[in-house]
Swiss-Prot record:
Belongs to the RNA methyltransferase TrmD family. GO terms for molecular function: tRNA (guanine(37)-N1)-methyltransferase activity. Its main location: cytoplasm. This is tRNA (guanine-N(1)-)-methyltransferase. Keywords: Cytoplasm, Methyltransferase, S-adenosyl-L-methionine, Transferase, tRNA processing. S-adenosyl-L-methionine binds at residues 110, 130-135. InterPro entries: Alpha/beta_knot_MTases (IPR029028), tRNA_m1G_MeTrfase_C_sf (IPR023148), tRNA_m1G_MeTrfase_TrmD (IPR002649), tRNA_m1G_MTases_N (IPR029026), tRNA_MeTrfase_TRMD/TRM10 (IPR016009).
């Protein structure tokens, strides 16, 4: 999987290249990260990449020309182009699974007051948001997207079964988890987890997943019940 990030602040991604699991995946060539500076493509002699908004309005807007030329240069494979935007569909686990099947993804990061709508409407395939709030740029959102999608790629986590027990993978939240010591400040690990009975342990975990989802995310729990009933199970 290759991620091509178009940004005005390429140095923002230096940390990601050496960060934990994702950094190791890059070093082991499981994923590839290409960070491209949009400013390198501007034809403005002052290296300007933004301008005033037609019709008036606060702030400046990123112009079409440098973004378009950048896309034309780097997206030789006609890969999916994702624009990080608060107007996009909110990122979830199912979208991460879907994107992990792509061979290459181009991620456009906006800044200032955003990007000229002609770029979004005609040269981007999809807008994705990481939540219903506004940030100063798309870089942090792009890092979240890269991290979430990369975890779905074979060998990135070391154990390909790991992500399948994550919260949201099968709609339900993850079960409660415990490690040593067996008793901490009077709080004990559930006895069944120490029993060695794998069938009972799995039953406990399933119940814990259901309870956590119902308690913490009623909206997801109702969605789970709806899909379960539709499936006839």
């Amino acid at each position: 999987m290759k991620f091509i990030i178009l940004t005005l602040f390429p140095e923002s991604f230096d940390y990601l290249k050496s960060y934990g699991v994702i950094g190791k995946a890059i070093q082991n060539n499981l994923i590839e990260l290409e960070v491209v500076n949009i400013r390198d493509y501007t034809k403005n002699k002052h290296k300007k990449v933004d301008d005033e908004i037609y019709g008036g309005g606060a702030g400046m807007l990123m112009t079409c020309q440098p973004i378009y030329d950048c896309l034309e240069d780097v997206n030789k494979n006609q890969s999916k182009v994702v624009f990080m935007s608060p107007q996009g569909k909110v990122l979830n686990q199912q979208k991460c699974i879907e994107l992990s099947k792509e061979k290459e993804i181009v991620i456009l990061c906006g800044h200032y007051e955003g990007v000229d709508s002609r770029i979004i409407n005609h040269y981007c395939d999809e807008e994705i948001s990481i939540g219903d709030y506004v940030m100063t740029g798309g870089e942090l959102g792009a890092m979240v997207l890269i991290d979430c999608v990369s975890r779905m790629i074979n060998d990135v986590l070391g154990n390909d079964e790991s992500y399948k027990t994550d919260s949201h993978y099968n709609l339900l939240l993850q079960e409660d988890s415990y490690t040593r010591p067996r008793v901490f400040n009077g709080y004990e690990v559930p006895e069944v987890l120490l029993s060695g009975n794998h069938e009972k342990i799995e039953q406990w975990r399933e119940k814990s997943r259901l309870n956590n989802t119902k308690l913490k995310r009623e909206d997801i729990y109702q969605k789970y019940l709806k899909e379960k009933n539709q499936g006839g199970s």
